[in-house]
Amino acid sequence: MATLKHINSKNADYGAAEQYLLFEHDEFTMKPVLDETGRLIPREDYRLSTLNCGGEDFAVACMRANLRYEKNQRREDVKSHHYIISFDPRDGPDNGLTVDRAQELGEKFCAEHFPGHQALICTHPDGHNHSGNIHVHIVINSLRIEEVPFLPYMDRPADTKAGCKHRCTDAACLLYTSPSPRDPKTSRMPSSA
């Protein structure tokens, strides 16, 4: 079964998230790893897609939306939310999970749970400890750009409106990881099976 981790960020540089996902980083210091000439080292294997960016770069699309709605302008504002879905290392050999399938699952999870948000979805085949766990990073702009239907974890009407901010509530995290009403043995987390 997959696990979910949430990190919110006040960093106004949306490009930093993409840089982290595309280039090697020291997993302990979080600093980029450089080659002998001082250049960033691209990650060897990843899948990357965006959602609701209108064909623009994720960072540019987020900055345009923030300006349009006059949000995320203050230093203390949470600018983005980073969700990491980590699959069990056994999901590869036992259930046939591949990086491509994990990317599909991440895109579906993002579309279902973060509708109306600009998103960057990136899948890596392994972590820094070489445990073999495929993991999906989902980075969303905290600002919703489209009105969406009221979802079970939302507790205010404003949570559905374009121009309003995403809130990672306890109810949302419980919903994401709770058993599915369709099948109590499974969670709403993406399943590799």
PLM segments and residue spans:
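N-terminal nicking endonuclease/strand-transfer module with a His-rich metal-binding environment
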Residues: 1-178
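Single conserved hydrophobic/aromatic residue that forms the stacking wall/gate
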Residues: 176-193
